[in-house]
Amino acid sequence: MGQAVRFQEVLRKLAIIDERCVADQAGLSLALPTSGLLDPKTAALVQVGALVAIGSPAVCLEWGTTRALAAGATADEITGVLLAVGPEAGLGRVAGAVPDVAAALGYDVETALLEDPDGP
C-alpha cells in the first residue's frame, strides 16, 4: 500500500509541477538561471516562448506564465512573447497556447470570444 501511495503522490506533484519534487525525483532544476547573462524576468519570458514553441500542455504554459509574472513580467510583455514566437512557432501553436496563458493572467479569452457581438 505504501508504494502505491508513494507513486500516486509523486505523480500528483509532477502533474502540478512541484519544483521540489521535480528536482528530488528527476534531478531537474526548474530554477531560473542565475548566470547573470539574462536577468530573471528575461529568462522567464524566454521560457514562456519556448513552452509555446514546443506545444507544451496547459499546466506548463500556466506555470511558465505565472513564473514570468513572479519575475516581474507584465501581461503586455508576455503577450508580446506570443507575438514574437508566432512567425517561428506557427500561428497554430500560438493560438493553442493563448487560452492557457490568458488563464494564468486571469483572463478567460474563450468566454470573451463568446461575448464578443462581432465574433472572433
Segments from the language model and where they lie:
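C-terminal structural segments of small proteins and small subunits
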Residues: 79-103
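Winged helix-turn-helix DNA-binding recognition segment
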Residues: 73-77
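Short alpha-helix boundary/capping elements
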Residues: 50-57, 86-90
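Acidic, glycine/proline-rich low-complexity segments that act as flexible tails and inter-domain linkers
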Residues: 1-43, 55, 62-66, 70, ...
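Short, structured motif recognition centered on aromatic/hydrophobic residues
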Residues: 43-51, 81-82
